[in-house]
Amino acid sequence: SVSRGLGDVYKRQILMEQPDISTPKGRRDLAMILLLYDSAARVQELCDLRICDIRIDSLPVVHLLGKGRKSRDVPLTKPCAQVLRQYICENHLDIPERRNDQLFTNPQGKKLTRSGVSYVLAKYIHKANTAVDSFFPQITPHCLRHSKAMHLVEAGKNLIYIRDFLGHESIETTQVYAKANPEARRKALETMDTRMNTPAMPDWNDDPDLKAFLKTL
């Protein structure tokens, strides 16, 4: 079902609260999971990201290389961009010599694999289920992509925009999400708005808890 996964804001909040952001690894994991959802990236696209693929300025975007080696630029929300900015600065990834390095690596400094990303997500799903008593079903990285697609449809984004956002070859593939919600489909067909209003992200050094902020995601 295309509606599986993080079906509401509360679930997303619970998941994003699980990484321990008092540790570098927890901050990396939050950045990774938040980017995976925010960009609706395929898991391999996330693994392939290099530092130069992230542009963090007044209009933050991530450059994704998808199926058939077709690339697309996906806009990022301000909260996601701020988390990424802090992750990049903290790890000194913002120097010219490192621009072609992998954005996310495993503990050995090697490129992340799809199974590695799945392992990280599964760990936090398990942690969330322990905290909230089996609150989540089995969620894979691809479920985050499904969830983002559904949320774009429900927000009334037009289908051409969603197709390009997801990197679909055909609008018919994108319509699968819209058909799951007829009213959302009508709105998606009518609207041409392509931007989302998002809150500003506090510095995690100034606000190590972040829970109040995460409620706004």
Where are these regions (language model features)?
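Conserved catalytic core of the tyrosine transesterase superfamily
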Residues: S1-R4, D8-L217
